[in-house]
């Protein structure tokens, strides 16, 4: 004669609790998105002198990127912005920016634009945030008319 005895160590309540705990952890991870902060200075008082003070920005994929744009120019004509774009689209974006005009902050409605700041007048500081795109190489540029050749850099997302 043999007797089989079965014991159950788990319950439906434990399974549901585990699922709920995992969902909570995921929600916390999303709400604790890392913020990467960068300060970019717009320098120069003439077309020949104007530039951003840093050539590259590197951020992690999916992070929140916080940009502080400081326009250190004194000349009233030196108005700047900073626009993050798909790599290799700078000339296209610059041309479209002129057409889009001041009312759009010289940021064209183009799918190659990732994010862009307000216009910063001389002596003004602008702060804005955006989510870093997928891993890859991108660019940043001032799209104020005539500035894109001198005021540009690379945005690397790791």
Predicted regions and their residues:
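Beta-strand acidic-aromatic groove motif in beta-rich domains, primarily in extracellular
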Residues: 76-84
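Short edge-strand/loop segments of extracellular domains
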Residues: 83-92, 157-158
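Extracellular/periplasmic metallocenter environments
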Residues: 17-23, 70-77, 111-158
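N-terminal edge beta-strand
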Residues: 33-64
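Bacterial signal peptide processing site
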Residues: 10-13
């Amino acid at each position: 004669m043999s007797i089989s005895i079965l014991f159950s160590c788990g319950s439906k309540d434990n399974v549901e609790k585990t699922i709920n705990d995992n969902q909570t952890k995921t929600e916390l991870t999303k709400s604790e998105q890392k913020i990467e902060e960068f300060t970019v200075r717009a320098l120069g008082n003439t077309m020949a002198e104007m530039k951003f003070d840093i050539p590259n920005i590197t951020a992690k994929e999916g992070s929140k990127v916080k940009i502080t744009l400081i326009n250190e120019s004194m000349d009233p004509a030196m108005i700047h912005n900073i626009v993050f774009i798909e790599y290799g689209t700078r000339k296209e974006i610059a041309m479209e920016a002129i057409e889009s005009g001041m009312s759009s902050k010289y940021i064209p409605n183009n799918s190659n634009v990732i994010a862009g700041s307000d216009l910063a007048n001389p002596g003004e500081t602008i702060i804005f945030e955006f989510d870093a795109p997928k891993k890859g190489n991108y660019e940043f540029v001032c799209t104020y008319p005539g500035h894109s050749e001198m005021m540009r850099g690379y945005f690397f997302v790791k």
